[in-house]
Structure formats: structure tokens, C-alpha cells
């Protein structure tokens, strides 16, 4: 029985699961939004939020601890230089999960997971502003 077991197995071995979430955490931090299944998004939130909490205070110990988990210097640099200062005053809830329908092949529920205070790219801003102009003109 799986009473009081924390986490999802996701039908894979523990080494594979750890590798999946390490890569997904790197992708989320670098891109600030990714699309994945709902179960993986919920598990990824449990991994990424403590990382962001550690990155709010820039110490050598925190850098080494995060490097032992991620093993990617580019991601560590972005965490401490950009993401940590953005979330400094926020006490939790750094990610948002948005459901986005079902996958075509197997109807698995899909979701976007994104950082809450992410910086939107100029292409997205243009799209949003053009939609607002169309609504105002009607």
C-alpha cells in the first residue's frame, strides 16, 4: 500500500524520474514557461519552488547546494542574478500551473507551468496589445 508516500512514480525508475525533473527544472528556469503533463507539472512545482527560495539569498552554500541538484552553471547564474531578486519579497507560490487541454495521442491532461512574475517577451506584448486594440475598436 502507498499510504503516506510522497510524490508520483510517473511509471518510470527513480534514476530516470530524477533526470526528467532535473532537465525540466533547468528548462523552466531558462525559458520561464514550459508545457508538460499535469502530473509532471505538479511534481515539478515541488522541486522548483525550494530552489527559488534558496536563490533569494546569494551565498556560497546556497550556490553549492543548488549546483549539486542541477549541475548547470547557466541555470544557477540565472537563478541568483535574475529570478532570486524578482521573488525576494514573495514568501512562496513562485510558479503557476495553467491547464491547457489534452494531448492529441493519448488524451493525457496537459498544462503550462510558468514563473509567476516572469518577464514577457516583446512578441507576446505586441500580441496582447494588438488584441486589446481590436477589442477597443469594436
From Swiss-Prot:
GO annotation, cellular component aspect: cytosolic large ribosomal subunit
InterPro entries: Ribosomal_bL17, Ribosomal_bL17_CS, Ribosomal_bL17_sf
Keyword terms of this UniProt record: Ribonucleoprotein, Ribosomal protein
GO biological process: translation
UniProt entry tagged with the keyword Transcription regulation: no
Gene Ontology molecular function, alphabetical: structural constituent of ribosome
Subunit structure: Part of the 50S ribosomal subunit. Contacts protein L32.
Family membership: Belongs to the bacterial ribosomal protein bL17 family.
Protein name as catalogued: Large ribosomal subunit protein bL17
Organism, as annotated: Buchnera aphidicola subsp. Schizaphis graminum (strain Sg)
Gene: rplQ
Amino acid at each position: 500500500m502507498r499510504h503516506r508516500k510522497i510524490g508520483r512514480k510517473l511509471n518510470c525508475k527513480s534514476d530516470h524520474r530524477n533526470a526528467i525533473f532535473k532537465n525540466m527544472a533547468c528548462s523552466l528556469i531558462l525559458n520561464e514557461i514550459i508545457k508538460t503533463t499535469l502530473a509532471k507539472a505538479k511534481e515539478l512545482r515541488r522541486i522548483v519552488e525550494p530552489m527559488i527560495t534558496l536563490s533569494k539569498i546569494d551565498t556560497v552554500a546556497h550556490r553549492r547546494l543548488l549546483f549539486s541538484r542541477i549541475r548547470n552553471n547557466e541555470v544557477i547564474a540565472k537563478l541568483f542574478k535574475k529570478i532570486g531578486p524578482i521573488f525576494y519579497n514573495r514568501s512562496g507560490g513562485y510558479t503557476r500551473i495553467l491547464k491547457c487541454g489534452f494531448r492529441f495521442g493519448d488524451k493525457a491532461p496537459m498544462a503550462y507551468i510558468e514563473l509567476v512574475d516572469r518577464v514577457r517577451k516583446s512578441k507576446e506584448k505586441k500580441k496582447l496589445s494588438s488584441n486589446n486594440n481590436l477589442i477597443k475598436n469594436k
